[in-house]
Amino acid sequence: MVKDISILFLVIICFISCSTNISATNLSYTIPFQLIDDMVVIDISINGTSPLHFIFDTGTTTSLIDSISAQKTGLISDDTQGLLLNNDFLEMPIAKIKTLKTGNIVIENRPVIITQSFENYNRILGIPIHGIIGSDLFGKYITELNFDKSQIHLGRGIDTTGYEPINVRIYNDLFYIDATIFTSDTDSITNQFLFDSADMTAASLAQPFWTKHNLLSKSKSFYSGINRSSSSLTSPSYFANFKGFKLRNYSFKNTYLNLTSSKRGFFANDSIAGTIGIDILKRFNIIINMNNQKIYLKPNQKYNEPYRINTTGLRTRLNKDLTQCFIEAVLQQSPAEAAGLLQGDLLLSINDIKANKENISKIRQLTRSIPGTKLVFVIQRNNEIKEMTMICNTFSDK
C-alpha cells in the first residue's frame, strides 16, 4: 500500500480457508465508500458495534483489524497466522467475526487477523483507520469498483457493457496485469504489475526491476522522497518522471512513478515490476472477476484529472492524537526549501485554510497545486508565528 504521500502497505500471505455464511438471499450487494485523499474507505459494523473505518485494498488477501478495535468489538484470538508485514514475517493472532455488516451485505463467521494500529494512515488521512479489507471479502463475487457513484457492487453477474475486458494473472489470490513504461518515444519496458488500490501513487516499482532496467537514469527527472507504510515505518524512495505509462489501450503521459527501495518483502521481488496504484485506478470504473481471471475497465469522470505531483517539496502529517499538523519533511532543491520551511515546523494554515484533521486532504491537495500557484504558509517555530510564501513548481535532483 505513494504519490505525494507514499504509502506502501502490502500484505502477501497464505489465504485463510474459511466457511462464510451470507445471511441475505439477495445476490446483489452495494457498499458505499468515501474517497479520502484517494484512499477507498468503507464503514464496517462488527458484531453489532458502531461502524469502523476500513480501507478497501485489492493488494491484500485477507482482512486485518487493529488490536484496540478487536478488543472493543469482542474479538478473541484462537489461533495464529504467518504474515509478511512491513517486510517482516510475523506470527499474528487470528479471531473470528460473528457478524460483519457493510452496506447491505451481512457476512457471518469471518476470520480476521489482529495486527498493530494503523497509525500512519490515521495521521495521513485525518480519521481513525481500524482495519483493511481485501480479496477475502470480494474475491468470491464479481466486483465493481465504481468511482463515479462512490460505490462497490458485489454480485454473481454485473453488466460489463462499455467496459474493456483485460485478462489478468492470479497468484496467491491477487491479480496482476501487464503494463508498459515508456522511457522515450522508441524505448519501453513491459512487465506485470499488481493491482493495488491502497497504493496512493500512479505506480510503484520494485527495486530489482527499476535497478535492472536502469530506470532512474532513464527518467526525465526525479526527486527523492519517502515511502510510508501503514505503521510509522518509512523508507527512502524516488519519484521519477517518465515519458509515459500504458495500461492496455490507455496511455498516460509524463507520469511520476514511485521507485521503491525495499530490500525485503514484496518490493524486493525480482519477478514483478511493482504495483499499479490508485492515482491511475481511480480514473476507471473497474469490474473484477477473479473466477474468470478478467478485469474490465471503463474511463470515468476522473479520467482526465491532474496527477498527484508534489510541487512544493514538503510532506505534512498529523501528530498521533490528530490535533496538530507538522511538516514531516522538506525535500532538497524544492520550493519549500527555497521558502525557508523546515522539518518539524508546526503548520497552522495554507492560504487561510487551517491545517487540522478536517482539512488535511485539502492541505495535501494544496501541496500538489499546479506550477505557478502562490501559497502562503503560516507556521509556528520556536514559539514564534511566521508567514512564508512560495510559488509552486516542479523540481528535480537530476
Feature locations, PLM:
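Pepsin/retropepsin-fold aspartyl endopeptidases
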Residues: 18-398
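Bacterial Sec-dependent N-terminal signal peptides
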Residues: 1-29
